[in-house]
UniProtKB/Swiss-Prot annotation:
This is Altronate oxidoreductase. The gene is uxaB. Belongs to the mannitol dehydrogenase family. UxaB subfamily. It comes from the Bacteria. It comes from Pectobacterium carotovorum subsp. carotovorum (strain PC1). PANTHER family: ALTRONATE OXIDOREDUCTASE-RELATED, MANNITOL-1-PHOSPHATE 5-DEHYDROGENASE. The keyword Ribonucleoprotein does not apply. Pfam families: Mannitol_dh (PF01232), Mannitol_dh_C (PF08125). NAD(+) binds at V18, I19, Q20, F21, G22, E23, G24, N25, F26, L27, R28, A29.
Length: 488
């Protein structure tokens, strides 16, 4: 069987125009996949040089396949049909290990054609390392490595205005472009680089904050043999991802022309402020996940897909999003409903087995950040509590009992994953309920009164403790399926 490389699979190679910090599955099935589409369908003509930002030889470099690899995009499309789209990605030219090839790394700054810089160095990647210096080869932190490269470019081109870069970090932190620029400027000051360099950074480089959204499931270990037979070649870098993707860029509108986004209809938005899109994602996608988990799991289900296929639970999720989350968000209604429909399709993706227990990690914090803002805003705007969101809170409290109904009259226990103080508190409270020394109302009040966690005393929200207590009582006495029926 043939090995995947450019000799066996010749095709067009594009000039280096993009630097990418990070070689992981996400960027390869998100940024590199989109650039490959733009290269095929427009005149973008942009090749990518990947910079491996950490000192590691695992996985092997993409150079072993001349930068080629295959994506398998699969899920439900906009019509609700299951689709599967293999694609040979040709946008990556080569990979540089900054720790082994530092001179080649600096040489990237000398290339007049380089225009864009993408990165995904994990949430911890955009961070400050006090000991980093200009003379390090390389510095430790990603922002310091980038500052060194930018300074090399500034010096090589004598501060030319047209040699600045467009920087699009994809790390999952708020306003990632702002954070990255702040650290680059901090290193410039710490290293006592010239004021003209700082002016060049500010005036001729564009740092964009981004929001990225796609579930990338990565290397499909169990399917490799079948994929090799189907495609007719060996690929060490198979990369699988869902059909849905969204790339929101907070930046100038001229980016659409530079990236040729005006010539191909990709799901990329260039906006003035990324915040409403972040709130939409957190509230609808993450919020629906968080509301779903305890309800579905206590109803006897184990995966997101099973839950959405269940008539009762699927309807609960749909109504929660449509009637209690979407109405309180500040974006055009059409955009919100379209995104909500995409979320429901993603939840129903038959190619992804998303375990409810894996999503349950740190459920208390997730409820505070993902659902509580909508719950409180709904009450403020409508003068009443959103019944399904409060039911999700009651279900979450019930979930921390650590047991659900099994076959017959048996109880099934399961692992709980949260901060130790919550696990200890719930263990004590639920033991008290079992021994009739703590009432459900007392349990709910203890949970809601924790101002350190909720950042306020939720027992002061009129009617909340009473409503959650009543809903919890129904769950305990009648079981989850009977309890949730009234909200479907």
């Amino acid at each position: 069987m043939q090995t995947l490389n450019r000799r066996n699979f010749p095709g067009r190679q594009h000039p280096d125009r993009v630097i990418q910090f990070g070689e992981g599955n996400f960027l390869r099935a998100f940024v590199d996949w989109q650039l490959d589409l733009l290269n095929e369908h427009t005149d973008l003509d942009a090749g990518i040089v990947i910079v491996r930002p950490i000192d590691s030889d695992f996985p092997p470099a993409l150079d072993t396949q001349d930068g080629l690899y295959t994506t398998i995009i699969r899920g439900l499309n906009e019509q609700g049909e299951a689709v599967r789209e293999p694609r040979l990605i040709r946008s990556v030219n080569r990979e540089i290990n900054v720790y082994r090839q530092f001179d080649e790394y600096l040489a990237l700054a000398h290339d007049p054609n380089i225009r864009f810089v993408f990165s995904n160095t994990t949430e911890a990647g955009i961070s400050y390392h006090a000991d980093d210096s200009l003379s390090d080869a390389p510095p430790v932190s990603f922002p310091a490595k980038l500052t060194r490269l930018l300074y090399e470019r500034f010096c090589h081109f004598d501060g030319a205005a047209d040699k600045g870069w467009v920087l699009l970090p994809c790390e999952l932190i708020d306003y990632n472009g702002v954070a990255l620029k702040e650290l680059v400027l901090r290193y410039a000051a710490q290293w006592k680089l010239t004021p003209t360099f700082t002016a060049w950074l500010n005036d001729h480089n564009t740092f964009c904050s981004t929001l990225v959204d796609r579930i990338v499931t990565g290397y499909p270990r169990a399917e490799v043999e079948a994929l090799q037979q189907e495609m007719g070649y060996q690929d060490t870098f198979w990369d699988t991802a869902e059909h849905f993707y969204l790339f929101v860029i907070q930046g100038p509108q001229w980016l659409a022309e530079e990236l040729r986004l005006n010539k191909l209809d990709l799901n990329v938005r260039i906006v003035d402020d990324i915040k409403p899109y972040k709130e939409r994602k957190v509230a609808i996608l993450n919020g629906a996940h968080t509301a779903l988990v305890p309800v579905a799991f206590l109803a006897g289900l184990d995966t997101v897909g099973e839950s959405m296929d269940d008539a009762l639970i699927g309807k609960f999720v749909e109504k929660t999003i449509a009637e209690e989350i979407v109405p309180v968000l500040d974006l055009p209604h059409d955009e919100l409903t379209s995104f909500a429909q995409a979320v429901l399709s993603r939840f129903r993706n038959p190619f992804i087995q998303h375990q409810l227990l894996s999503i349950s990690l740190n459920g208390m914090t997730k409820f505070r950040t993902r659902i509580l803002p909508q719950l409180l805003t709904y009450r403020e705007r409508h003068g009443e509590l959103p019944a399904r969101l409060t039911f999700a809170l009651a279900a979450l409290i019930a979930f921390y009992r650590g047991e659900r109904s099994g076959e017959g009259d048996t109880l099934q226990t399961y692992p709980l994953q949260d901060d130790a103080h919550w696990l200890e508190r719930y263990s004590t409270l639920w033991a008290g309920v079992k021994e009739n020394t703590v009432s459900l109302a007392e349990l709910v009040n203890v949970v809601l009164r924790d101002a350190d966690h909720w950042e306020q005393d939720l027992t002061q929200v009129p009617g909340l403790a009473a409503q959650v207590t009543e809903q919890l009582q129904t769950i305990v006495e009648r079981g989850m399926r009977a309890a949730v029926e009234g909200y479907c």
